Amino acid sequence: MASSVLEMIKEEVTCPICLELLKEPVSADCNHSFCRACITLNYESNRNTDGKGNCPVCRVPYPFGNLRPNLHVANIVERLKGFKSIPEEEQKVNICAQHGEKLRLFCRKDMMVICWLCERSQEHRGHQTALIEEVDQEYKEKLQGALWKLMKKAKICDEWQDDLQLQRVDWENQIQINVENVQRQFKGLRDLLDSKENEELQKLKKEKKEVMEKLEESENELEDQTELVRDLISDVEHHLELSTLEMLQGANCVLRRSQSLSLQQPQTVPQKRKRTFQAPDLKGMLQVYQGLMDIQQYWVHMTLHARNNAVIAINKEKRQIQYRSYNTVPVSEIYHLGVLGYPALSSGKHYWEVDISRSDAWLLGLNDGKCAQPQLHSKEEMGIKKNLHSQIKQNVLFQPKCGYWVIGMKNPSVYKAFDECSITHNSSILVISLPDRPSRVGVFLDRKAGTLSFYDVSNCGALIYRFYDPAFPVEVYPYFNPMKCSEPMTICGPPS
């Protein structure tokens, strides 16, 4: 019993690294104890990138500087060294089970401890043997080497575990982003359908009001006619009840009234006014909207570059621009009202949106960064001034050959694209027909494809206009011009 207790105590004060009684025992934060030399060597060969080591027993990280001497364990070790008795279990372990002799030899071929009779037996005869004291240090070093290799492998496993944890976090984040993206896109689709449903319901509500007002008017007219007929019937019946003399005296008047009475059939709603609801091309709408959502992934964050211009105001976030002067600006100076967005766009795909819901005059698109004033050839500039002579050729101020790729609105019903003929390169103003006034315009630049597209975000992302110019300059800049409208234009941020 005493020997069992002694073995338990020795096990508690044995170094997990060298498997010997602890020498200069130190303890880590996890309370496991090691020889100072062993844990120092272990830390030097296995410390993490953050300067911490991992406990060889429980793998819990620890700062090397936190190792503390364990005097209590050191005292126990010193007392055990003075204890000379050999436990019964150790005595049994040191005795050959076959011959009853002490195990003093080590067979190198069979890698086992034997007694002197085993050495002479047929099983081990001729094998190289040595005293166990002679191979003690050799095999300790081998085991120590094996331990270091295993600990390195354990470190590799820990690194792999860290990599897996990072991958887990990355995947969770990516999937969460995808979940939010799916939810946002389907919310957009639901909002789109709700908007279209509301439009149709408003049309029906308006139609119902018009029809009911018309029918009510017809009912009132019919009621007036009915009252006239009944009054006349009452007069005729009254005359029939009179004496012959009295009847004949009033008959002529009553008959004239009766003969002159003509009925007009009340107006009804013609059958052609009736309409059967036809759902819009939802498939086409969704395809267009999906296309818009696909390019919205290229949303670029930009700011407006403040220019030294007294008539232009830019807010401190540099995302809103408006005309603030009440002085008359000459037509030839309108280009000065333009402001560039940054950064420059030199490659790849880029998308941004502009809120123009309150503006009734604006220009949007790209500029080559020079904002140079083009040579004017006529008095016709964006339709603001009329030609002085019908033979004067129309040219535009904002055209691709002058470094502008823009569309604009002069008033809520006139939309124009300032392009040029791909063959003659003559400037031209193209009038754009839109079903509704856009409140938000999306702009998409694809440098590789050489296209600049404008979308009506407020109308399911319908395409407004597209420039095809594979020869864009090396650097182009988003261009914003509030014209002479005092209402602001605002660069929108991406949806949250």
Swiss-Prot record:
Keywords annotated in UniProt: Coiled coil, Cytoplasm, DNA-binding, Metal-binding, Nucleus, Transcription, Transcription regulation, Zinc, Zinc-finger
GO molecular function, one term: zinc ion binding
Chain spans, region Highly hydrophilic: 205-210
Occurrences of domain B30.2/SPRY (ranges): 281-496
Distribution of this protein across tissues and organs: Highly expressed in spleen and lymph nodes (at protein level).
Domain of life: Eukaryota
Expression induction: By the TLR ligands lipopolysaccharide, CpG dinucleotide and polyinosinic-polycytidylic acid.
UniProt xrefs under Gene3D superfamilies: 2.60.120.920, Classic Zinc Finger (3.30.160.60), Zinc/RING finger domain, C3HC4 (zinc finger) (3.30.40.10)
Span of zinc fingers (B box-type): 91-132
Protein residues bound to Zn(2+): 96, 99, 118, 124
InterPro entries per the UniProt record, alphabetical: B30.2/SPRY, B30.2/SPRY_sf, Butyrophylin_SPRY, ConA-like_dom_sf, SPRY_dom, TRIM/RBCC, Znf-RING_euk, Znf_B-box
Biological process annotations from GO: negative regulation of interleukin-6 production; negative regulation of NLRP3 inflammasome complex assembly; negative regulation of reactive oxygen species metabolic process; negative regulation of toll-like receptor signaling pathway; negative regulation of tumor necrosis factor production; positive regulation of protein catabolic process; positive regulation of viral entry into host cell; protein autoubiquitination
Motif (Nuclear localization signal): 268-276
Entry-linked Pfam families: SPRY, zf-B_box, zf-RING_UBOX
Coiled-coil ranges per UniProt: 173-239
Signal peptide range: none
Subcellular location: Cytoplasm; Nucleus
Effect of residue 35 to S: Reduced interaction with NR2C2 and enhanced interaction with TAB2 and TAB3. Does not decrease TAB2 or TAB3 expression. No effect on inhibition of ROS or negative regulation of NLRP3 inflammasome activation
Zn-finger segments (RING-type): 15-59
Subunit structure: Homomultimer. Interacts with NR2C2/TAK1, TAB2 and TAB3. Does not interact with NLRP3, NLRC4 or TAB1.
Function: Trans-acting factor that regulates gene expression of interleukin 2 receptor alpha chain. May affect IL2R-alpha expression through cis-acting negative regulatory elements or through competition with proteins that bind to enhancer or activator sequences. Negatively regulates Toll-like receptor (TLR)-mediated activation of NFKB by promoting degradation of TAB2 and TAB3 and preventing TRAF6 autoubiquitination. Negatively regulates production of reactive oxygen species (ROS) which inhibits activation of the NLRP3 inflammasome complex.
Protein name in the entry: Tripartite motif-containing protein 30A
Species of origin: Mus musculus
Gene encoding the protein: Trim30a
